[in-house]
């Protein structure tokens, strides 16, 4: 599930079972794996791959 306030670049690959929280930003060339949870206010950019079954906590910033 992708929260309605999340911003997802069209070039990002998000598996259907992943969850993206409110106000998170997912940039191009980012991959979010199966059953991963991205909490609120997270920023993920660059050539970044988050594997399956991961949890990224609120206000984290990952990538370039």
Predicted regions and their residues:
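Acidic/polar low-complexity surface segments
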Residues: 63-64
